[in-house]
């Protein structure tokens, strides 16, 4: 059905039809010429103004749009390609390829506006999603089909953790991942693409980008584009999918911009009045079904570090676990720099993870907390002033801190150490042994950047051998000096 543009107000475009009224969320296409180039703009219907006139939100820049241009209603919402063909490629909000690679004919397309799975299809089991990362699996385990908040400043290793998770899901669970770049920097999107290429994980992930320089419609709907691709892998292929959203705050922020542009009365702190329902509608689609699951890791930017801001506060209500990255841990050279005391999970419950796992996790946190409390005394008076019991706690805590580090597959290029995937059983056994004092005789350096506890024992032997050789060399030098 053909109509024409009657008004252009930045990213908001009014379209008038003669005998037709498009539905809310229907896609309208405008083809026009700008500086001698053919352009195609997709608009999404956001409001009915009466007299067959609709107000739409543009999914790209509206440069060059003029009143009177022909607009064609498609009769359907925005639909994007789905299936295995999307892996290794970069898409924009409308499902067009933007990686300058070879063109592909996609045979399957799904609408980005979908209902969540019905209750009878959803899985009621509480299962752990094993990541192979010790600190996560032990202290803040992810729920299969759950939602994880990833908190951390710039340069503490968010991207590396995301890439490692993509790697482990692909190689250990034979699963796929979808990455949605929601309103982040174009440079970061480019860096992530290149790093994934170098780390050989690109062919297991689909990338959807709606970056900072794009209109609010594109930044908001890109999250739905990525989620739709993930839903296909879950519902049609029965896979366990990992969905990354960087950054979920930008989803709320762009929704707020759209709301203001449409003239809706703002709510608290200027956010849209529908903030909670929009977030709920989106998050409800991320779930486990009897066929497969979508587990999402969502980077959360907290504006001005204010946790009570409505945007992050609305996200917190949906999270099952939080992974907090701490700069002070990264400064010690411990990677991944996950804070073992700040990170949380609703899965850390003896009825879900079992008594042994729960006791070991709480034991580790207890020792680390005591060590944290003792640090002021150590800084002022030194280790010698501590009681024997406290000295033992400090020694074990330092070993635990070191043992929480691990070499990543995707960081092999930088560290020179082969990556390690550590099963949950090995992780629990290793930390249980440290808490029980089985490894009190091993040096703390033996626990740094190793996989399971057997590797720590082997590393301790190597360190002992090296120090023995050093002592022999020193003795030989002394003997030669005496003879000389």
From Swiss-Prot:
It catalyses: ATP + H2O + 4 H(+)(in) = ADP + phosphate + 5 H(+)(out). The keyword Cell inner membrane applies. It is an enzyme of class 7 (translocase). Its EC number is 7.1.2.2. Signal peptide: none annotated. It is found in: Cell inner membrane. Keywords: ATP synthesis, ATP-binding, Cell inner membrane, Cell membrane, CF(1), Hydrogen ion transport, Ion transport, Membrane, Nucleotide-binding, Translocase, Transport. This is ATP synthase subunit beta. It comes from Campylobacter lari (strain RM2100 / D67 / ATCC BAA-1060).
